[in-house]
């Protein structure tokens, strides 16, 4: 197959996306596919004489083969990317990206956050008739916006921490229940997320979250164990328990090797396992998700589950959760990536 892997972008998860994209491209090439790895924002700025040649040479915008070299030599800073791009317009999709994707059998979305995950890119690809991995524009939009996600969960009677959506600092000051969690409405990888214990901490956390987005979500803090349940083709995988060695499960805990103890399959009884998988399936269906996703949960001391949020384009880095869950089912990361590119669930 001829496959385009899209990575990079302009979200706060740009660096993680580049790492995911590099891994995905390597896995697909190991299966014999012709793979072009593109930065969706930077695009391919040279004049294209022969798109076929890009596939045959397995073009990569990172100009390297190893993961470490790829990421090290790639623009990971958003400001630097904007300055380097020749096209100075506000367009999210870089030059020649659509044209190259149109010549592929499928486009593998290794993007995280922002326009690459919130449904905008998905809708654009739909309009051009370009096949891609992951959920469509509707599910992507619902899952990316934490305020909308919470509303859907409440309408479908899926238990979730109580919370509010705020569009400015003044309105956010109405919140008076502590401890609580403050987070950007559509961010990922826990960037800009804070746990606060009192009003003074809360004001600082609100300012911090608003640096990243114009809307924030504030919700009750629930004490409990944290789990994540991946789904492939609507089938829930074994839950994985996430236990940071210190503090919250923040950006550093997610991507720094050894910062978090991740146990899969989780050390839980059959009843709890079923409860988490069933809740994940309900959330997956309620948000109109497709293909694959990951749903995050908290489990309190009473055994009550709280559905936190959904991730429509789970990471593919060495520390990513969904590949670990798939491995428990006997699906290697290479096989998982290969089969996602084929959009088949025949291995389940």
Where are these regions (language model features)?
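ATP-binding N-terminal substructure of ATP-dependent carboxylate-amine bond-forming enzymes
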Residues: 1-138, 142-144, 148, 167-173
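Active-site nucleotide/adenylate-binding loops and adjacent lid/helix of ATP-dependent enzymes
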Residues: 3-7, 11, 19-22, 94-101, ...
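Residue-level detector of anion-binding/catalytic polar loops
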Residues: 34, 131, 159, 215, ...
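Phosphate-binding site of ATP-dependent enzymes
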Residues: 197-278, 299-306
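Conserved metal-phosphate-binding beta-hairpin within the catalytic cores
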Residues: 220, 229-231, 284-316, 326
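A short, polar/charged loop-to-alpha-helix boundary motif
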Residues: 249, 317-324
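Conserved small/polar residues in nucleotide/adenosyl-binding loops
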Residues: 337-344
């Amino acid at each position: 197959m001829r496959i385009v892997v899209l990575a990079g972008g302009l979200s706060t998860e740009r660096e993680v996306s580049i790492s995911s994209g590099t891994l995905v491209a390597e896995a697909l090439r190991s299966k014999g596919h012709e793979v072009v790895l593109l930065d969706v924002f930077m695009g391919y700025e040279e004049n294209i004489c022969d798109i076929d040649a890009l596939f045959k040479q397995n073009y990569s915008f990172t100009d390297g083969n190893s993961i470490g070299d790829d990421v090290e030599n790639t623009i990971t800073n958003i400001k630097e990317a904007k300055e380097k791009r020749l096209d100075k317009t506000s367009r999210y999709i870089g030059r020649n990206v659509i044209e190259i994707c149109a010549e592929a059998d499928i486009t593998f979305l290794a993007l995280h956050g922002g326009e690459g995950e919130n449904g905008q890119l998905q809708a654009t690809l739909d309009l051009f008739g370009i096949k891609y991995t992951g959920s469509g524009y509707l599910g992507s939009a619902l899952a990316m916006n934490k305020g909308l996600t919470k509303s859907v969960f409440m309408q479908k009677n899926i238990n979730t921490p109580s919370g509010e959506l705020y569009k400015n600092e003044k309105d956010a000051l109405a919140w008076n229940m502590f401890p609580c969690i403050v987070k950007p409405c559509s961010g990922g990888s826990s960037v800009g997320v804070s746990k606060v214990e009192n009003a003074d901490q809360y004001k600082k956390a609100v300012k911090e979250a608003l640096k990243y987005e114009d809307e924030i979500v504030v919700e009750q803090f629930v004490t409990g164990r944290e789990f994540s349940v991946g789904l492939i083709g609507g089938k829930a995988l074994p839950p994985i328990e996430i236990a940071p060695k210190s503090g919250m499960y923040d950006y550093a805990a997610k991507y720094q090797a050894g910062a978090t103890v991740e146990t899969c399959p989780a050390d839980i009884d059959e009843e709890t396992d079923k409860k988490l998988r069933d809740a994940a399936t309900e959330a997956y269906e309620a948000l109109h998700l497709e293909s694959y996703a990951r749903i995050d949960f908290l489990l309190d001391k009473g055994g009550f589950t709280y559905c936190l949020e959904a991730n429509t384009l789970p990471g593919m880095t060495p520390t990513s959760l969904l590949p670990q869950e798939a491995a428990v089912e006997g699906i290697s990361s290479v096989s998982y990536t290969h089969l996602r590119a084929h959009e088949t669930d025949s291995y389940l």
